[in-house]
Amino acid sequence: MTDPDSTSPAPDPQQPADPQPTDPGRREVLRQGALLTATALGLGGGLTLLTRRPAPAEPAPDPQTAAGRVIRPTGPYDTQEAMTGYRDMTTYNNFYELGLGKDDPARHAGALPTRPWTVVVDGEVKKPVTLDIDTLQSWFPLEDRIYRMRCVEGWSMVMPWFGFPLAALLRRLEPTGAARYVQFTAINAPDKLPGQRPWVLEWPYTEGLRLDEALHPLTLLAVGLEGRSLPAQNGAPLRLVVPWKYGFKGIKAIVRMTLTRTQPQTTWALAAPDEYGFYANVNPAVPHPRWSQATEQRIGESGRRPTLPFNGYGEQVAGLYSGLDCGGTSKWRAARPPMRGSVQASCWAGYSPPFSCCGTR
């Protein structure tokens, strides 16, 4: 088997059926929501036992009045499962720029300035751009996607996003023949974001995908959740959704996308290289070094359920990794540069499961 972290070109993804776009009224929802983001999103949720649901610091909105209409898409764009409740989706979050606790992102949501917001796309692309988020959203029809989300900590949700395929943006800007990967960079504002003031991770948060992963039809740039503008605690105004990977790959509050020739370094692979690899595909057969990935706790349910390979999207994405040893780590570890600053053990002492974002080798 070949090394999954090599820089050789990868095969083209299989294309599932085209999704159905949302109604045009979504754009007005986004425009109105952007004006309220800084003041209306102070909800609550804490980095506690992952089976323990913390009470919000402030009452969460009633899902019947806070959320908008969701158009159920077709094919792989809908899991045909019950969606997680809006309160849970918006008060039980990992977004370390806003704090380490599950409730911190909702509590500190007003600290994230989502307008004005500029997005840069550069690197190995023929048409690099710098544009504001509202212009970017106007380029594409917005689509509903109801996806499973699986965190490496052992919990999961079913989340109704809306946004546009990353492939639509990349194809419009035309990657060069040398492009092999996409690196994503999140906001870096320690003067505003409380989670960036202590030294926990190296900021800004970065992530990456292979180009064929980025071009896959399931890969989404989300701008909304359950029919309304994306809440700050869920990564407003622009976040990545890659449903077959552990949740840490879904970088939030994106400000830059850079197409590269070589595999980019990513935040968690630098922080804990023995625990977090580049691919981070959901795999129940490969445990995290400190816990099993065979089962998961669906938030809002009792008991645990089996975890599905590729989070249930194997039919669509398994072909991307044909011949690759995505479970092995020996070559990956040997090829990785020395850590530039791992997460201090004191940062996760006392937590269960240990402090982590999402994703294993």
UniProtKB/Swiss-Prot annotation:
One of its GO terms (biological process) is protein repair. GO terms for cellular component: cell envelope. Residues 1-57 form the signal peptide. Its cofactor is Mo-molybdopterin. Predicted to be exported by the Tat system. The position of the signal peptide cleavage has not been experimentally proven. InterPro entries: MsrP (IPR022867), OxRdtase_Mopterin-bd_dom (IPR000572), OxRdtase_Mopterin-bd_sf (IPR036374), TAT_signal (IPR006311). Pfam families: Oxidored_molyb. Binds 1 Mo-molybdopterin (Mo-MPT) cofactor per subunit. One of its GO terms (molecular function) is oxidoreductase activity, acting on a sulfur group of donors, quinone or similar compound as acceptor. Its EC number is 1.8.5.-. Residues 10-22 have a biased composition (Pro residues). Keywords: Metal-binding, Molybdenum, Oxidoreductase, Signal. Mo-molybdopterin binds at residues 93, 96-97, 151, 234, 239, 250-252. Residues 1-29, 49-77 are annotated as: Disordered. The keyword ATP-binding does not apply. Part of the MsrPQ system that repairs oxidized cell envelope proteins containing methionine sulfoxide residues (Met-O), using respiratory chain electrons. Thus protects these proteins from oxidative-stress damage caused by reactive species of oxygen and chlorine. MsrPQ is essential for the maintenance of envelope integrity under bleach stress, rescuing a wide series of structurally unrelated cell envelope proteins from methionine oxidation. The catalytic subunit MsrP is non-stereospecific, being able to reduce both (R-) and (S-) diastereoisomers of methionine sulfoxide. Belongs to the MsrP family. This is Protein-methionine-sulfoxide reductase catalytic subunit MsrP.
